[in-house]
Amino acid sequence: MAQHSAVAKARKAIDNLTLTVDTYKSAFNTLQPALTNDETRNRADTWALASRIQIEMYDKYMDNKQVGKQVDTKAMGHALIDAYTYSMNALKLDTIRVLDRKGNAQIDKKTGKPKVKTKYSRDVINRLVEHHNDYRIAGSALYNVKDWDGAYTAWEDYCLLASRTDDRRWAVDDTIIAEVRYYQGIAAWQRGDTTAAVKLFQTAREGGYNHKEAYDYALMCLSDLNDVQGVVTLAGEAYARFGTNDPQYIRILINDFINRGEYDSANNLLDEAIATNDKDDELQNLKGLVVESQSNIEDAMPYYLRCIELNDSNAQGQFNVGRYYYNQATQMRDRSRLVGKKLANLVNPVYSQALPYLEKSYAINPNNKDLRNALRDIYYKLGQADKLQAIESVKD
């Protein structure tokens, strides 16, 4: 009976005309033991009251905010989130069997099951309907204070309410749901749930949220998951929608063709992309790699040179140009019958020609082992002991 008394006391506390956030907190603290006590935890009225307290406390927070008072954004948002949970419990428990005059359960002729009625559901539903959009607002507020879990849950509650069929007032346009799912995906990514984020971004796109960021975030998440095929598939969808406005999509597709040895397909796609954007250094470098794979590095050199002309900080482009001269010097050395100083006079100028490109590439990307080995060889052959010692000291 003690917990029944707690429920009654909490109900009386919130029936006062002048209430504050602290009043609602106190009322909920009075009620809280009843949510777990066997006497009261299986009663719909217990949970309906808990829901009402949380929603009205949320409203009081909002009133305070609107008149310029400082409010606890996180506590405000979680009051609404808790109200959803308590409301669902109330609705689940709010079934009263209809009895006949003899006290026996009445049977529904259509279903053959006992007839039931509800006592609290109407009020619970009405409160939620009135606050449906507040869940979307609360999600944004919680996100802004970096409460990723809270934002995720508030947006999930919003979408779950929109999917209910027990009241036509829940209906929300699909495009709004899609946008909310996108933001929920961002929250999932922020809290480290990358798999959930990928699914939510997909749901957003399927619902009509086809903004570029819905593809870009998903690509990033798929990459983090090492889902190579997923990245390629989504890049294809993004390329079909956005074309070469963002070269990252076509680069992914071209690299995939190259990795699978489908050079003709890679070439065709590259030519299409370069025709649209001939000042993209990475496309020029990729074109060179494809041409080299199909033919030789001599035919690829114009593309590598164009790449570093457009962007002298393109490490791969610098490496490829330097690699051309380094390989040329190595071949000359292998094929020549000269020895000693005469051989050095023949090949060292070509090694020297390779050096600035390779050093530039190394300064940008020192993790390229092939590049480091080439520099080590050149420094040795040119007698540059200090540079050789420096690069020898680098650990793999």
Q: What is each model feature region?
A:
Residues 18, 22, 41, 53-145, ...:
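Short coil/linker segments at helix-helix boundaries
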Residues 46, 167-169, 180, 213-214, ...:
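TPR alpha-solenoid repeat register
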Residues 13, 54, 142, 181, ...:
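Residue at a conserved register position within TPR or TPR-like alpha-solenoid repeats
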Residues 39-41, 95, 163, 209, ...:
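Short coil turns that delineate tetratricopeptide repeat
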Residues 29, 33-36, 92, 160, ...:
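Conserved structural position within tetratricopeptide repeats
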Residues 49, 176, 183-186, 217, ...:
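Canonical tetratricopeptide repeat
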